[in-house]
């Protein structure tokens, strides 16, 4: 979230791991939240 991170690529060697961690958790979370929310409307 710091501006100009592309200016210092050496300062972010863990960018790939961070990206995988964020998306690996965010994608299933959004999916389950959407599924649960849709189920609430489908049941009633």
UniProtKB/Swiss-Prot annotation:
It is found in: Plastid, Chloroplast thylakoid membrane. The keyword NADP does not apply. One of its GO terms (cellular component) is chloroplast thylakoid membrane. Keywords: Chloroplast, Electron transport, Heme, Iron, Membrane, Metal-binding, Photosynthesis, Photosystem II, Plastid, Thylakoid, Transmembrane, Transmembrane helix, Transport. Its cofactor is heme b. With its partner (PsbE) binds heme. PSII binds additional chlorophylls, carotenoids and specific lipids. Pfam families: Cytochrom_B559. The chain crosses the membrane at residues 19-35. The keyword Transmembrane applies. It is a single-pass membrane protein. Heme binds at residue 23. One of its GO terms (molecular function) is iron ion binding. Its main location: plastid. GO terms for biological process: photosynthetic electron transport chain. InterPro entries: PSII_cyt_b559_bsu (IPR006241), PSII_cyt_b559_CS (IPR006216), PSII_cyt_b559_N (IPR013081). SUPFAM superfamilies: Cytochrome b559 subunits (SSF161045). Heterodimer of an alpha subunit and a beta subunit. PSII is composed of 1 copy each of membrane proteins PsbA, PsbB, PsbC, PsbD, PsbE, PsbF, PsbH, PsbI, PsbJ, PsbK, PsbL, PsbM, PsbT, PsbX, PsbY, PsbZ, Psb30/Ycf12, at least 3 peripheral proteins of the oxygen-evolving complex and a large number of cofactors. It forms dimeric complexes. Belongs to the PsbE/PsbF family. This b-type cytochrome is tightly associated with the reaction center of photosystem II (PSII). PSII is a light-driven water:plastoquinone oxidoreductase that uses light energy to abstract electrons from H(2)O, generating O(2) and a proton gradient subsequently used for ATP formation. It consists of a core antenna complex that captures photons, and an electron transfer chain that converts photonic excitation into a charge separation. NCBIfam families: cyt_b559_beta. This is Cytochrome b559 subunit beta. The lineage of its organism: Eukaryota, Rhodophyta, Bangiophyceae, Bangiales, Bangiaceae. The gene is psbF.
């Amino acid at each position: 979230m710091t501006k100009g991170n592309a200016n210092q690529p050496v300062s972010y060697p863990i960018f790939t791991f961070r990206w995988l961690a964020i998306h690996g958790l965010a994608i299933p979370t959004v999916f389950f939240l959407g599924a649960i929310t849709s189920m609430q409307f489908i049941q009633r």
